Amino acid sequence: MRWFAKIDLMVRLLVLAILLASFLPAAGNAREIAQWISHGAIFVLFFLNGLRLPRDEVLQGMRHWRFLIPVLIWCFGAMALAGKGFAIVLVGSLPPLVALGFLYLGVMPSTVQSATAYSSLAGGKVSSSIVAAALTNIAGVFICAPMFAALAGSGAGEMGVDGLTKVFAILILPFAIGQLLQGRLSHWVRERKDLITWMDRISIAIAVYVAFSGAVEQGLWTMIGISEWAILLAATCVMLAFAFIGAWTVGGQLRLDRGDRIAFLFAGAHKSVAMGAPLAAVLFPPQVAGLVLLPLLVYHLLQLVISAPLASRLARPLRPVPDAAACSEPTTTARDR
């Protein structure tokens, strides 16, 4: 089991949550209790997010508009439209709610920890990465649900006004309170970093467990056969390639320096299950949330798989092009001999 211990801890918790939901799903009264626990954990999670996301750094980083505005446009514009396109194309090949999950994936903000960590490993500008991740997550709290509802149209019928009201009460309200109290309590958060990181992970795992419990009760594993899993995996790989290649290309077209271009790559291509799982748990009933979450969970796993070798490759120093003098030097030396 050593190989399992080497896997990212968040991925391990997600796998365990899915396995637990598959073999021991929360049903009946247990599901209602699990939902209340999940909503309470999500409220605390977004309160802590409000305390931690660096408002001052974001406000200062707003001056770097040439970097930040394209990140927002790519993350919530290009990726959202790509997700919409995938949802339309796949609706005949996958269960409708799973196909809709590609749109849900597209409107998610960037990750905070992993995008920043891989940007740092690749030699990118950490300051730009932190500001981009924080800004997309702050924006995501307010715009992900309305954008999904607008692009999904009738496909978002399960959401309704009640769903958006829950988003305000369970996500936006605690996040706003956390931002307001950031000056007073930020030191308390910093002193308990490990504990709060675990609270984050457990909250997300609970949300995934509740969502998948509902999906399993609806017959998830019989509803999606081997061919559908293959299509889901292939489509997610294509969307992942679009995200990474597109973000890198846009960074080049904007003539960003190498550090900013690397930060743009990871901030633009990564998608946050830390936002997606809690939001789905609030927006949808469990039997819907589990199916809608599938593309995001697969994407999240694949983005971690590809990011480690990619960061290592980008971290290698570029081989300098020898100038004319350097090229002529060995010839001169040989002739003198």
Identify the role of each PLM range.
Residues 273-337:
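C-terminal transmembrane helix pair
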Residues 60, 113-125, 249-252, 280-285, ...:
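Helix-loop junctions at the membrane interface of multi-pass solute transporters
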Residues 243, 247, 261, 276-277, ...:
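Short amphipathic alpha-helical surface patches that serve as generic macromolecular interface elements
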Residues 87-143, 148, 152-163:
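Membrane-interface helix-loop-helix junctions at boundaries between adjacent transmembrane segments
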Residues 1-93, 149, 153-255, 318, ...:
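Structural signature of multi-pass alpha-helical membrane transport proteins
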Residues 73-82, 107-112, 128-149, 168-171, ...:
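Membrane-embedded alpha-helical segments of transport systems
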Residues 65-72, 93-107, 124-134, 229-233, ...:
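The feature identifies polytopic integral membrane transport proteins across all domains of life
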Residues 213, 238, 251, 265, ...:
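Generic hydrophobic alpha-helical scaffold/packing signal
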